[in-house]
Amino acid sequence: MSEQVGQREAVDSPQATGVKTPPEPCPLCRETGPPQPPSITEEGKTNEDIDFIWVACNKCDEWYHSACLFLGDEKWRGTIPKEIISTVETNFGDEGAWTNWVEWIGKWYCAPCLARSTSPSNPRPPRHPLVATMKRASIQPKDIDQAGKPLKRSASTSAPLLKSNIKRPRTSTKGQETASPEIDMKSEREQQAESTAGTPASDAPQGRPKRKTAQIDYRNLNNSIATPTHQWLELIADPEKYGRTILDANYPALPGKLLTRAWLESQPLPGQPSSISPDLLPTRFWGPDREPLIVRPENGGFSSLGGHLPSKDLTVQDVANLVGPDRMVDVIDVSSQHSSQWTLQKWAEYIQSSSGNTSVRNPKVYNVISLEISGTELAKKVKPPKIVREIDWVDNFWRFSAGAGGKDVKEKGRGNDSRESSEIRKEGSHLTEGDNAGGEIEEDLEGLKEKTNTPYPKVQLYCLMGMKGAWTDWHVDFAASSVYYTIHSGAKVKLSCFVSFFSPGSYHSQVFFFVKPTEQNLKAYAEWSGSYEKQQDTWLGDMVDEVRKVELHAGDTMIIPTGYIHAVYTPMDSIVFGGNFLHSYNVDTQLRLRQIEIDTKVPQRFRFPMFDRLCWYVADKYCSDLRHLRAYRPRATTTPKPPHFRVLQCLSYLANFLVSQTGILEDPEAEDKARKLVHDRIPGDIVKDPEGLAKELKWRVERELGALGLLGEEASGVEAEEFKSNGTANGSVKIKGKEVSRKRDRLSKVFDKKAISRTWDFHPPAWSENRQSPQIETTTVQLPRPSTSSSDAISGSGPGASPGASANGGANENEQAELTTMLVKQTRKRMRELDDGTVIEESQETTFVEKKTVWGPKLDKEKISQPQGKVEEDMDIDH
């Protein structure tokens, strides 16, 4: 192939042949070649004299003639923005297709890519619809003048490539172009050198300037920057100017020592008295009115939470050294919202050059929000708060495999038991940084994480580094996971020549904007996040009930509860440590956000990693605990306590979710892709019988809730013997054939049984009826005579039709007729008294009206009448 291309290049070269080479066709060209402008025959030109402009699809990189697009059918012409089409036709007429209107295009997509993006068969549709865009909001007069100028052809015969065979890509720069696929391309450096040597400066190719168009940043959807930043910064700076209201949150600060799992589970059962102060209720974290928890330095700071941070003189260069200078990290350009990968060393050097100690600060504002540091030297200097470690699903339920010579999965599961029990024994005490209690257990867990040879969700340790002016748009953390967030204290200038990330005495803060996760607000967020247009031009605060603002300073720590919608503004350079965690106190919201992510087509790689698999681990562990809770212990001196009622309520949601997942596996009408997806996310090494585990968990949870009086008696009265017919969670009972089907049918009836109403034996008192005698009134009226045919009666002719209507569509004269109206009223009433003295009276009233109109041949002489008694007899209606 390379030899053929080289031969063609030699033959086509003007140096070799002295003849013109026909232009390269595009996929839309006709068999006769590219389209010719109307003036080509008048001026005596040929097709080889025309410089065809090329445009590439931003999705598939396929190249097309701009003229072929403009002159194509509606499918292809419709890919061009309408404003461009109207401007070209208005200013250039028939010659417009050959003008350089491509210069006005920002992003463009070909028809096949547009069709595929909306096709139901596309397994991975785009997050937002593909739409062609323009460089500017409107086309300026200078743009029109520039587009009408002809592209000059080089007069030099030493040009290495014919200009007619050169594509002008949408990202090409002046003096650099990309040859067509049929020409053997030299290296970029050689081509630039030859172009400089052989092409006059005045004849240099006029390509489009290179630019990076603003795009949605999917790499960091958890903290995405998906909208134009500048307008939101202006809005939050002066909300009143734009007619908006942002309230101060004024969330009360809490003492750090209070935040433990024991505090979360100190809420008594509904209806029972509580001795907890209203400001310290644990429902502030997991209740319907939950709100962010803030711990200030005066309340004990991060250390009082049982956490640990690096020393205060930590710099970005230190972060790079501890994590690895060559570690790649996603760096977000806040202004263009474009994400690119840098090494940490490059990031540290950029921050150093942008420090307040330098004379000139870099104008570009960047943000790093996705640096996960697990398994690094920096991770050894960071410990999450105790409450996070106590309730985090990953730490407490994930099955880590240590590999050869290490603990197996079952031993890790027993390690969970011992770790949790030891934490429960110490729940009344607080661990300071110097305490070693429980240290061996935590070290074992960290050792398992380091030695594991299987992936696990690494979301608990993040280092975030933001420059002044950074903005993180509205988002809910993946799977509605909770977040702990602490601002590292300001660094001092080192004695060495290195310039610190922070200038001395700088004021470090973060401003959070919160929207409460109510049902309506979550619906509004789902609508906003699922619409590219609304993310671009709609302030989410306009779609929700209210927006509240919280400002954090260096040393402050905040724990954001499940499902909170929030945005973040960084007014000063900052280093932040934080992480995400799932827990058992808001499972319903976590599952709800999982569904929102599916509905809004969030790519799987931007959701909580291995979420479904983690749910199965949680279900297996809790089901085992509930099974042991009811086990007979002949030598036991104490009785184990069931999980907190809030945990049981949330486990009910989890069980229903897992039952629905197994339902997909059992559904023969479900798509194979959906069934395989569910199957692959079940940890088969632990969960041998997914359906049995899900239903057993549902049954055991409902039994415990019933014992606490939080469920109907029927729901908690399912006998264990009935459940055992389906086997244990490990599938120890194996039954084949019809017996399995028969027992499953019986089980489904048990679990699908509806609770009987508490008023099933209630007999209300009888009604006392009062029926009035019919009231009959006869009057003489003037109405047109209706048609007696059935078709006309159906079409509306008759007394109810418009006056003057007749069978033939004409107008009849009014005739005298007799109208008889009968009115019947019936009322009934009943009254009962409850045990507490409440009296309830119910009444009903029914009115029946019947009308009859009679036309006669001689109404003016002979009155058509009927004895009143007979009419009443015929019309009497028995209710």
Curated annotation (Swiss-Prot):
Annotated zinc fingers (PHD-type), start-end: 23-116
A GO cellular component entry from the record: nucleus
InterPro entries: JHD, JHDM1_Histone_Demethylase, JmjC_dom, Zinc_finger_PHD-type_CS, Znf_FYVE_PHD, Znf_PHD, Znf_RING/FYVE/PHD
The keyword ATP-binding appears for this protein: no
SMART domains for the chain: JmjC (SM00558), PHD (SM00249)
Localization: Nucleus
Sequence ranges of Low complexity compositional bias: 786-818
Cofactor: Fe(2+)
Note on domains (UniProt): The JmjC domain mediates the demethylation activity.
Residues of the JmjC domain: 416-598
Amino acids binding substrate: T472, K492
Species this chain originates from: Cryptococcus neoformans var. neoformans serotype D (strain B-3501A) (Filobasidiella neoformans)
The protein, known as: JmjC domain-containing histone demethylation protein 1
UniProt feature coiled coil, ranges: none
E.C. designation(s): 1.14.11.27
Pfam families listed in its UniProt record: JHD (PF17811), JmjC (PF02373)
A single MF term (Gene Ontology): zinc ion binding
Catalyses which reaction(s): N(6),N(6)-dimethyl-L-lysyl(36)-[histone H3] + 2 2-oxoglutarate + 2 O2 = L-lysyl(36)-[histone H3] + 2 formaldehyde + 2 succinate + 2 CO2
Stretches for region Disordered: 1-45, 117-212, 407-449, 763-879
Primary role: Histone demethylase that specifically demethylates 'Lys-36' of histone H3, thereby playing a central role in histone code.
Keywords of this entry: Chromatin regulator, Dioxygenase, Iron, Metal-binding, Nucleus, Oxidoreductase, Transcription, Transcription regulation, Zinc, Zinc-finger
Binding site for Fe cation: H475, D477, H566
